[in-house]
Amino acid sequence: MPMVLLECDKDIPERQKHIYLKAPNEDTREFLPIANAATIPGTLSERGCAFCGAKLVIGGVLKDTIQMIHGPLGCAYDTWHTKRYPTDNGHFNMKYVWSTDMKESHVVFGGEKRLEKSMHEAFDEMPDIKRMIVYTTCPTALIGDDIKAVAKKVMKDRPDVDVFTVECPGFSGVSQSKGHHVLNIGWINEKVETMEKEITSEYTMNFIGDFNIQGDTQLLQTYWDRLGIQVVAHFTGNGTYDDLRCMHQAQLNVVNCARSSGYIANELKKRYGIPRLDIDSWGFNYMAEGIRKICAFFGIEEKGEELIAEEYAKWKPKLDWYKERLQGKKMAIWTGGPRLWHWTKSVEDDLGVQVVAMSSKFGHEEDFEKVIARGKEGTYYIDDGNELEFFEIIDLVKPDVIFTGPRVGELVKKLHIPYVNGHGYHNGPYMGFEGFVNLARDMYNAVHNPLRHLAAVDIRDKSQTTPVIVRGAA
């Protein structure tokens, strides 16, 4: 049976349906892990909430927009400054977040007046910013505050501003994935086709599902500029509020993160007939394939091949240097959703690194279907993995490096296993040709860092001898 019940889960046997071990000659469609389902009580889930999926992942990335969190201060603090998505206007989105700072009395008597006051104060404090997104949180949703009515009143009082509301409290879904969906659908229902922008190229597209982590969007933008393609809107990396209102003007929707942003691409296709094209931007082979797909759509294949050749000539020798030193290493991926299937084949093909275990916090069954198809036999696939499962899986597969976020990364350090930040990156960008060399460099530095050997020594134990560190030793 390919579904696995770990030792730590023996008292929660329901978890067996969420953990899959790929075996030879199996129809993986029969054995997909249950995903996008409510967390089993007692499993200590590491998932983010639905509000987090809307604000932290998508809305909070916009570079020219006030982010107003209608709720307790903690909801704003928890989703501020935890993602590295810089912008070309001084990182406005990373510097500021706004909260109505709801207290017990506001929950009892209602918070709409407090929200209205906070919105006016925010616009007064930031006179150059005319756009705002307002989010509900658990307490303000439970008491029924009508944030749409408040937003309409503020826009009536201030005709030069525009406000978008996201009614996605943390409890509204099983994971942050619900927040992605709510914001996607809300935006196309309320804001798309409310503005027109100047079209300057015969080739136009929306780039959807990229959030400019450490400059991903800005690096890929250099490719689109060289190909002569105008990006109408970035959803939402280094993007602007008003550009997203013009998404209906594009000829093509290019989707990178399908889990967080595929919904709006599907709706743009239904309502405006704009085709959807999914690509992978991590990895040399995947990036080249994505460029070829886009160029084939626009009929500019020669330009695409020229770009790929230039990038390969510049970066492939550096990638090969790292591949020679990483070949045969084992890696575990412990991240959110689609990065599992974006990364698993790229690190294996381009770097010779074997992926031995993967866990997804908010992936759906279709995400597991993709990653299992790309993965190798003997690999573990876990939905909504918890800390105890993490320790047991790591002990079973013994990876040389782990891709995860800082939260799990702190646990990894205690196990004396190097990790690379798969959420906010160590030293990105990681997308594109140059970006994948950056990723290989960070993997190499993590795996071969001599300092980690020192961490394995308990200085309180006099029987242990401090190891001699040899330069260049693994």
Swiss-Prot record:
Looking up SUPFAM superfamilies in the UniProt record yields:
Helical backbone' metal receptor
**Organism superkingdom:** Bacteria
A Pfam match: Oxidored_nitro
Q: Which residues bind [8Fe-7S] cluster?
A: 49, 75, 138
Q: Which GO terms describe its molecular function?
A: ATP binding; iron-sulfur cluster binding; nitrogenase activity; vanadium ion binding
| Catalyzed chemical reaction(s) | N2 + 8 reduced [2Fe-2S]-[ferredoxin] + 16 ATP + 16 H2O = H2 + 8 oxidized [2Fe-2S]-[ferredoxin] + 2 NH4(+) + 16 ADP + 16 phosphate + 6 H(+)
Tell me its EC number(s), please.
1.18.6.1
Which free-text remark accompanies the cofactor? Binds 1 [8Fe-7S] cluster per heterodimer.
Q: Which residues cross the membrane?
A: none
Keywords carried by this UniProt record: ATP-binding, Iron, Iron-sulfur, Metal-binding, Nitrogen fixation, Nucleotide-binding, Oxidoreductase, Vanadium
Q: Check the record and name the Gene3D superfamilies matching this protein.
A: Nitrogenase molybdenum iron protein domain
Record: residues binding [7Fe-V-9S-C-homocitryl] cluster: 257, 423
For the protein in the UniProt heading, the enzyme class is oxidoreductase
The Swiss-Prot or TrEMBL record lists the needed cofactor(s) as: [8Fe-7S] cluster; [7Fe-V-9S-C-homocitryl] cluster
Task: Please give the family membership noted in the entry.
Answer: Belongs to the NifD/NifK/NifE/NifN family.
- Summarize the protein's role: This vanadium-iron protein is part of the nitrogenase complex that catalyzes the key enzymatic reactions in nitrogen fixation.
Checking NCBIfam families in the record gives: alt_nitrog_alph, N2-ase-Ialpha, VNFD
Q: Describe the subunit structure.
A: Hexamer of two alpha, two beta, and two delta chains.
Other observations noted: The structure of the 7Fe-V-9S-C-homocitryl cluster is assumed to be analogous to the 7Fe-Mo-9S-C-homocitryl cluster.
Q: What is this protein called?
A: Nitrogenase vanadium-iron protein alpha chain
Source species of the chain? Azotobacter vinelandii
Task: Supply the gene name.
Answer: vnfD
